[in-house]
């Protein structure tokens, strides 16, 4: 039997078409579909040679097609599967997730149309929980494989090959023989020993060598029971980990085969078993090999000692699901975190330079404005830590979760759906009709009732915080600290924006907040309204808004600034070890900008990090050098008086001899250091900081 396994499409989940296209290379290079590659390896162990299709790669082929405006992605995918590469395929198995389930079903219909005699089968978390209703609603789906499929899939393929009855195969849902009834067999047993599973068939993924963060399954199952989460149901709350020896062997194999040593270790709750985490870290350290990795954890299942060990063993990223900043809501949703401890865990990760995703949600049925303020406060408070990346989504009632079950009869379809089910810019009317007709299948595209909050307010607050964090991180934190709560600032901003006629073009709120017009408008609001009318620390706020304005300007001018005759490219061939001669002519590097702000920037940042007072910041004009690099975030340096003078002279394109002469004329004195020596040393420091270079 010829088998084709197909990944769930995720590349359509962008805020806009433009974003989707620019993210293409990154997504293609980083997201190997490890789930279907693991199943492919199981089939290979049984002597089969499965095909693997990554629908994200098909999606990007469609983006590059000159005729894409004449055909939808679904039609393009249908034509792709109708091609000769799939002639003779007997079994098409689709992995599914909630966000792209409508699209997957429509592509499956195209496959069935092209291959009517082939079995079209669904698996994965979404199909597993809506198996019966899916088979009833969509006749082109033949079977659903529920839950973990490593045991079920080979048995199913064998039975279909031999024409045997499916009645004894655990973990499948299918149509009865001739009577149209749905048969749901008992659950398949969970995989008890994950070490016994074969190594995923990464050789079937053409872009595997381009993965920057290689996915490897670390374990399965979460023993907790949060009311909004579907993970515990899919894995039946059975927590399992691969052994440290097995994980180390897998990581070595990837490094030897593909030359990749950075890993995304896939597990929803790695740190539940502290002893096993310690064993894993110690095994990595004892190996003497340099691997970097990231995983997920609960903040109450780590402490600073464990975080330090994880960092030493190569951990560079942790996903923390905080969910809500409200103590009251922590209890209601059965998350049960102590939020002060959660903040400490984020701080500890920052201390050891571990990047943290701080995941938060809003839109719970019992959530009040006070609860929302607490969540927004936790979001912005996380910005104190350079290595923290807070996230904010709106609750999606996932099928089969306690929240969805409780509110299934009162769900409301929204045009602007929950983040976990973002449909993508190219959603077609067929998807909308499908979702509207079957709320029990597509519940994650609906919203739960919120008697205490307005949904439009919540959605705009989300966009404001997410886009504000990206555009003016320190100013957002400063406004939160100055006002007492960022939601108060947001409400003032809303009123000011409306009063000044700043309406969303075509009603597209998300597009407005994603564009450069938003920070420009917001900076005007801060200068013209917030600082004179509401700020307790006007000097600090003025310094921050001037800093963010300059920084934003460099972000959007970085591509053009290299054309400035007074600057040289940051990728210049200038030799950092070369000697300067008196005739060497110096210029600013590309992307370097010098600004003056009215207060000590370093002191403001220190107080923001430590939650110190901002109202007594003294007036002290300082110069900042902002250096934008092509591949990363801006570097900001507060200049000493000596560096500021020298950088100003370099802006004029003078030679070293001319700069030294001007330096002496200005009678700049450095105690205990001859002026000429101080000048040359200062020039070399600026050069090492990559602020200046030889012209």
Residue ranges and their predicted role:
Residues 503-576, 631-695:
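Long, charge-rich, low-complexity alpha-helical segments
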Residues 134-151, 312-317, 374-392:
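Structural recognition of alpha->loop->beta junctions
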């Amino acid at each position: 039997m010829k088998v084709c396994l197909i990944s769930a499409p995720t590349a359509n989940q962008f805020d806009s078409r433009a974003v989707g296209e620019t993210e293409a290379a990154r997504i293609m290079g980083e997201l190997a579909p490890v789930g279907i590659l693991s199943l492919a390896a199981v089939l290979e162990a049984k002597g089969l040679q499965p095909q693997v299709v990554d629908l994200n790669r098909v999606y990007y082929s469609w983006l590059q097609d000159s005729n894409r405006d004449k055909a939808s992605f679904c039609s393009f995918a249908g034509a792709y599967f109708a091609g000769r590469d799939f002639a003779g395929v007997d079994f098409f198995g689709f992995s599914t997730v909630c966000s792209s389930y409508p699209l997957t079903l429509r592509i499956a219909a195209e496959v069935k149309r092209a291959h009517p005699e082939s079995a079209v089968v669904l698996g994965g978390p979404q199909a597993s929980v809506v198996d019966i209703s899916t088979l009833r609603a969509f006749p082109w789906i033949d079977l659903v494989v529920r839950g973990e499929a490593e045991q079920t899939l080979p048995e199913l393929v064998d039975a279909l090959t031999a024409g045997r009855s499916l009645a004894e195969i655990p973990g499948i849902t299918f149509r009865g023989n001739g009577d149209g009834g749905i048969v749901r067999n008992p659950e398949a047993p969970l995989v008890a020993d994950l070490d016994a599973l074969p190594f995923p068939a990464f050789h079937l993924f053409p872009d595997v060598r381009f993965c920057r963060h290689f996915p490897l399954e670390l374990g399965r199952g979460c023993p907790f029971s949060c009311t909004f989460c579907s993970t515990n149901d899919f894995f039946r709350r059975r927590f399992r980990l691969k052994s440290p020896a097995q994980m180390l062997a897998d990581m070595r194999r990837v490094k030897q085969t593909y030359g990749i040593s950075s890993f995304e270790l896939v597990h929803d709750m790695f740190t539940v078993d502290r002893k096993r985490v310690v064993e894993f870290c110690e095994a990595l350290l004892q190996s003497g090999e340099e691997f970097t990795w990231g995983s997920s954890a609960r903040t109450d299942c780590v402490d600073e000692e464990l975080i330090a060990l994880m960092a030493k063993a190569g951990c560079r990223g942790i996903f923390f699901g905080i969910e809500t900043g409200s103590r009251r809501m922590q209890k209601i949703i059965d998350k049960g975190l102590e939020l002060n401890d959660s903040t400490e865990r984020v701080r500890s990760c920052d201390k050891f330079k571990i990047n943290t995703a701080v995941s938060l949600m809003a839109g719970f049925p019992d959530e009040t404005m006070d609860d929302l303020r607490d969540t927004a406060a936790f979001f912005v408070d996380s910005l104190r830590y350079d290595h923290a990346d807070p996230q904010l989504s709106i609750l999606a009632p996932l099928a089969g979760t306690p929240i969805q079950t409780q509110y299934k009869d009162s769900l409301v379809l929204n045009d602007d759906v929950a983040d976990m089910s973002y449909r993508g810019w190219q959603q077609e009317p067929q998807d909308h009709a499908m979702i509207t007709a079957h709320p029990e299948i597509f519940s994650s595209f609906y919203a739960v009732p919120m008697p205490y909050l307005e949904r439009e307010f919540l959605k705009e607050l989300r966009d404001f915080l997410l886009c504000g964090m990206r555009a003016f991180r320190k100013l957002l934190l400063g406004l939160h600290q100055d006002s007492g709560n960022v939601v108060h600032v947001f409400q003032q901003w809303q009123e000011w924006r409306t009063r000044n006629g700043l309406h969303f073009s075509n009603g597209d709120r998300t597009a407005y907040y994603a564009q450069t017009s938003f920070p420009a408008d917001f900076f005007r609001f801060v200068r013209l309204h917030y600082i004179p009318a509401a700020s307790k620390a006007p000097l600090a706020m003025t310094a921050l808004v001037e800093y963010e304005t300059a920084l934003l300007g460099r972000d959007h001018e970085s591509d053009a600034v290299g054309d400035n005759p007074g600057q040289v490219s940051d990728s210049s061939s200038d030799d950092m070890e070369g000697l300067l001669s008196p005739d060497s002519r110096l210029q600013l590097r590309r992307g370097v900008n010098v600004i003056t702000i009215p207060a000590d920037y370093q002191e403001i940042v220190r107080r923001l990090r430590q939650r110190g007072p901002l109202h007594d910041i003294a007036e002290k004009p300082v110069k900042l050098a902002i250096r934008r690099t092509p591949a990363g975030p801006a570097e900001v340096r507060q200049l000493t008086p000596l560096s500021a003078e020298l950088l100003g002279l370099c802006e004029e394109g003078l030679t070293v001899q001319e700069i030294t002469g001007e330096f002496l004329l200005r009678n700049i004195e450095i105690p205990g250091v001859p002026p000429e020596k101080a000048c040359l040393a200062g020039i070399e420091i600026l050069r090492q900081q990559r602020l200046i270079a030889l012209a």
